[in-house]
UniProtKB/Swiss-Prot annotation:
Transmembrane segments: none annotated. GO terms for molecular function: rRNA binding; structural constituent of ribosome. One of its GO terms (cellular component) is ribosome. HAMAP family: Ribosomal_bL21. Keywords: Ribonucleoprotein, Ribosomal protein, RNA-binding, rRNA-binding. It comes from Blochmanniella floridana. Part of the 50S ribosomal subunit. Contacts protein L20. InterPro entries: bL21-like, bL21-like_sf, Ribosomal_bL21, Ribosomal_bL21_CS. The keyword Ribosomal protein applies. It comes from the Bacteria. It holds the Pfam family Ribosomal_L21p. This is Large ribosomal subunit protein bL21.
Length: 127
């Protein structure tokens, strides 16, 4: 099972139990966070697609750690003027572990639902 969800302007592809880094969230370590802007959920039988979001779709995750990302170096340089300016930036990140992806079929209200077994059968048999 996997899902695609959105935080701000970024989209993340996650599976249950996966650990990912997202932009800093102002919650304490050990708390749970719930993401409601779910774009797509795929379970064993169906794919649910939102327009743009799935109504009752949610992803629950544990906050593991707050840290800084990799350093990005910025250089400003003017030729023949002996001018150089160096700057660095480290983005604040939050490490989360996906605990649960809501796949309760009766609760999900989505734009489109595709039955995977039927779709694959149609492609194989040429219907």
């Amino acid at each position: 099972m996997y899902a695609v969800f959105q935080i701000g302007s970024k989209q993340y592809y996650v599976r249950t139990g996966q650990v990912i880094f997202i932009d800093r969230v102002k919650l304490d370590i050990g708390n749970q966070i719930e993401f409601n802007q779910v774009l797509l959920i795929r379970d064993m039988k169906n794919i649910y697609i939102g327009n743009p979001f799935i109504q009752n779709g949610k992803i629950i995750a544990d906050i593991l750690d707050h840290s800084l990302g990799k350093k990005i170096r910025i250089v400003k340089f003017r030729r023949r003027k002996h001018f150089r300016k160096f700057q660095g930036h480290r983005q604040c990140m939050t490490k989360i572990k996906v605990v649960k992806i809501n796949s309760n079929n009766s609760d999900i209200e989505c734009y489109k639902s595709v039955d995977i077994e039927t779709k694959i059968g149609e492609e194989v048999h040429g219907a």
